[in-house]
Amino acid sequence: FVATIPASAAFNKSRIIDDFVFNAYNTMSTAQIDSFLNSFPDSCISTSRGFKAPNPTGYSPGTSFTYGTSVSAGTIIYNAAQAYKLNPRVILATLQKEQSLVTGTAGCSKLRYVGAMGNGCPDSGGGYNYSGFELYRIGSTVVKSVTGTCVNSAKSAGFSRQIITAVWKMKFWQQRSLGNVSWAEIHGSWDNSDDPALCYTYYMTPGNRARGGTGSGCTQVLSFDGNYTIDGTGVHMSTGATAALYVYTPHLHGNQVFVSTFESWFGSTLSNPVKLSYI
């Protein structure tokens, strides 16, 4: 599902994106996101096309994610960015990397909408079926069922669920890779107070980092050098955001597409050439 690579600057496999850029959640407003989408005549998720999906409205340990009435893609992306303090441009670049929904150049099939972020879509493929809840809508046509999607969980199936669960994962993985075991977004209708108990066993940035959690394999404190192998190539996890994106897409090519897409639209994924304090 990964798109082709547009022209861009050289790809630094060990520093995909800086944490400062990754965390810049106020880079675009709802109106700016919708305007950006409308600038592509064939966009699958523009207001010009009449696209809407349920609005992610909150999270709590007891009810998980909650959703409201259908709203524009810009509203969904903005609200997810605000909820987990993630740059909405990261979301837009991921939507394009995975399904080309921003430009619409690969078509606007139901499967692309339902697996919008490639979230929960393993390399082995899918073949999952879901029904009984709104996945998205175009104009007055509401889509409530899908057959053969790559998405392996109903919690992540459909445009809005793809967005909000992917954004949470990216931010959780970033924070854990930095050793922040107490991270949890708790504000307004968002209460992720159950996050500190979750196990994390993926890529870590260098230093003495706590994994946290109570699951199998969750050693509390270990020393990591930040060096791993991706697609047979040595990679150094220089930033938490870099580690998070490799957990999300454990391949060089997919992350190269992400960087190329982001930089062609929004500029560099790096805040400056100076190394951050935790590198």
Language model region names:
Residues 19-20, 24-99:
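Export/targeting segments at the very N-terminus of extracytoplasmic proteins
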Residues 100-106, 110, 152:
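Extracytoplasmic/secreted cell-surface and envelope-processing proteins
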Residues 96-101, 169-172:
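Glycine-rich, acidic and aromatic/proline-enriched surface loops and short helix-turn segments
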Residues 1-9:
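Sec-dependent, cleavable N-terminal signal peptides
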Residues 90-96, 118, 162-165:
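Structural recognition of the beta-strand scaffold that forms the well-ordered cores
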Residues 8-35, 43, 124-279:
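Non-catalytic cell-wall polysaccharide-engagement segments
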